[in-house]
Amino acid sequence: MSFNIAVAGKGGSGKTSVASLVIRYLLKNGSGPILAIDADPNANLGESLGLTVEQTVGLMLDAFQKDKINIPPGMNKQSYLDYKLNEIIIESKGLDLVTMGRGEGSECYCYPNLILKKFADSLAENYAYTVMDNEAGMEHLSRRTTQNVDGLFIISDHSVKGIRTVARIQGLVSDLKLVVKRQLVIINFVPTKLDPLVIEELDRLGIDSIATIPQDEEVYEYDLRLKSLLDLPDTSKAVRAVNDLMTNLFKTEGTHTKGGKNDSADY
C-alpha cells in the first residue's frame, strides 16, 4: 500500500520546491520506490528534480483524440490509452515521474485530471510512496484530485495573506469531506522566526500542526541555475527543515523509513 502525500498551496509559496525536498528525503531515507506526480498544468516539478519532461498527460490526450481511429488491432480504446499513458512515465533510480501538463489550447483540466487520477491510482500499488504536487490554489480540491491521502501538506509563504489561503484550503477540505488522514501546514521562506503578525493570524484562525522552512539561499541558487534540488547538500537549511518534518511525520504515523530523528522542525 502506497503512502500518499499531496502538496497544495497558493502560487509563489514554494510548494514545488517543498515537494522536491520531500522526494529527496524519501530517496535517502525511504524503504521503496517513489511515484512523483506533477498535477500542475504549469508543470515544473521535473525541472526541480533534474528530469527532462518531453511528454505529458495533456499532450498525450490531444494526440490520442486525433489518433484514436488508428488503434492497433487487438487493442480497445482503453487498453490503447493505458499503453500511451505508460509511455509518458519518466523513470530514474528509485523515482518515476508522471506530468499532467496541458493540451494545445485547452483551458479545461477536468478531463486530464480525471485521467491522471485514475492512472495514478492504478500505478500506486507499485510504489512505496506517492508525492503529488498540485496546481496552485484550490481548484484541485473541488475536482477531488486531492483525497485519499495520508498527508496533505498545505504550503504558505511567510505572510498573513498566505495564512488566510491556508484557512480557505482547510475549510474546503472539510466542506467537501475529502479523505485526508493528516494535514500539515508548512510556512516557507521564514527569515529567522515567525513574524508576530503571522503568529497572530494563525491563532485567530485556529491553525495548528505547523512546520516552518527558513529562507535558503542555496535553494534560490539551485533554482536560478536549473540544478536539481535533489543534489542540495545535507547542510542546506531547507533540506534540514524538511528532513525534520518528514521524520516527525513518520514517527507520528508509525511508518518505517531508514532515517533517524532530527529536532529542528517547529510544530
Where are these regions (language model features)?
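Residue-level preference for the first positions of well-ordered beta-strands
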Residues: 4-6, 33-35, 95-97, 129-131, ...
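N-terminal phosphate/diphosphate-binding loop that engages ATP/GTP or pyrophosphate donors
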Residues: 28-91
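C-terminal lobe/tail of nucleotide-utilizing enzymes
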Residues: 174-267
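Conserved catalytic-core segment of NTP-binding enzymes
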Residues: 111-212, 221
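Short glycine/proline- and acidic residue-enriched helix-loop micro-motifs
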Residues: 69-71, 100-104, 228
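Cytosolic-facing regulatory segments adjacent to core modules
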Residues: 79-87, 91-92, 96-132
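Walker A/P-loop phosphate-binding motif and the immediately C-terminal alpha-helix
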Residues: 3-41
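Active-site signature of alpha/beta-hydrolase-fold catalytic machinery across serine-
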Residues: 21, 25, 48, 144
